[in-house]
Amino acid sequence: MAVTPATANIRLTEGQVGEVAPGGTLIYPGVTSCLTVTVRLRDGGKVGAHASLFQVPGEYRSDRILAAVKQRTGARRVRAVEVRGAVGAWAPSYFTKAIESYAEGERVPVPAGPDPEGLARAVADGLGQSRGKVTVEDLPDGDQRVD
């Protein structure tokens, strides 16, 4: 799994988790059907994840990526968590059961519409943070840069 060391700037592609030191920038390229999760630490650093609807070989599945972010964050204090991207493409349950994990013939939940509140709760629960720290923003396709 791609967990990279803390650096000044980092590019996180689908299924990757990484960290930047205070003042660093997280770059999430080609966010289309994905969501990005950025944990802003009290010391100014950031832990980020580029969550993909479908697993990229060798990278984190959607139902494992929050655990990787939580492990990376550790006991450090969290100021805020930002979830951005294709909000309408994601059911909150994808963070607990990835699309790939459904058996043939098993019904995969399909979102009827955007559920920012459900996504915020799912991310807060997955990271062990309070719901009040999590914001969700639907963004058009493209690269995301978090300074």
Regions found by a protein language model. Name each.
Residues M1-D147:
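Active-site microenvironment for binding and transforming phosphate-containing groups
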